Amino acid sequence: MPTAKQLADIGYKTFSTSMMLLTVYGGYLCSVRAYHYFQRRSSRRQAAEEQKTSGAL
């Protein structure tokens, strides 16, 4: 039978691990959103430049 201290240690480690995983997952989601944002921005910029050049001809 685990003692109160052992239960507290297990609870603390479980909580710490879950917070660490949430932080890593949040960072992943943030970086994916930033990547897609910059991809869309560059494709829009390229499309606008193509439209300018085709309109000038």
From Swiss-Prot:
Topology, Mitochondrial intermembrane side: 1-14
GO cellular component annotations of the record: mitochondrial outer membrane; mitochondrion
Intrachain S-S bonds: none
Annotated localization: Mitochondrion outer membrane
InterPro entries the record matches: COX14 (IPR029208)
Listed Pfam families: COX14
Superkingdom as given in the UniProt entry: Eukaryota
Residue intervals annotated with topology Cytoplasmic: 38-57
A GO biological-process term: mitochondrial cytochrome c oxidase assembly
Membrane topology reported for the UniProt record: Single-pass membrane protein
Membrane-spanning segments: 15-37
Keywords assigned: Membrane, Mitochondrion, Mitochondrion outer membrane, Transmembrane, Transmembrane helix
Subunit structure: Along with COA3, core component of the MITRAC (mitochondrial translation regulation assembly intermediate of cytochrome c oxidase complex) complex.
Record function comment: Core component of the MITRAC (mitochondrial translation regulation assembly intermediate of cytochrome c oxidase complex) complex, that regulates cytochrome c oxidase assembly. Requires for coordination of the early steps of cytochrome c oxidase assembly with the synthesis of MT-CO1.
Listed name of the protein: Cytochrome c oxidase assembly protein COX14
